[in-house]
């Protein structure tokens, strides 16, 4: 029989509250705690949660890829992976046109081309920074 895994989504209005929810989820023996990009950065609560938990997986559902350059996103993900001892799950995603153009003040482009560039930056050869 397949094991049923149950995750929890953090909903607290503060990063401390989200980290505390992740600790509560672990105490309830949930499989993972997820943050999302709404009222705060999705990575910061997970950094706190990584220090307050020891077994639950921690992930972003989602971090908006368009709002970050690939290098800073990769470094944040790597740091969280190390801080959590391998429990971090990076969930990247796109947003709809109004969010991209209004909330982030970025030009709109077709998501497929941006996703391809993002995927190459994460799955391709090591990134290098010049300049």
Language model features: what each stretch is:
Residues 1-60:
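N-terminal beta1-alpha1-beta2 module of alpha/beta enzyme domains
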Residues 39, 66, 96-98:
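Feature marks short, surface-exposed loop/turn motifs that line or immediately flank catalytic pockets
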Residues 36, 63-69, 107:
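Glycine-rich "substrate-gating" loop/helix at the edge of Rossmann-like oxidoreductase active sites
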Residues 2-11, 70-131:
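Flexible, glycine-rich active-site loops centered on histidine and acidic residues
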Residues 43-63, 67, 114-127:
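Alpha-helix-loop-beta-strand connector modules within alpha/beta enzyme cores
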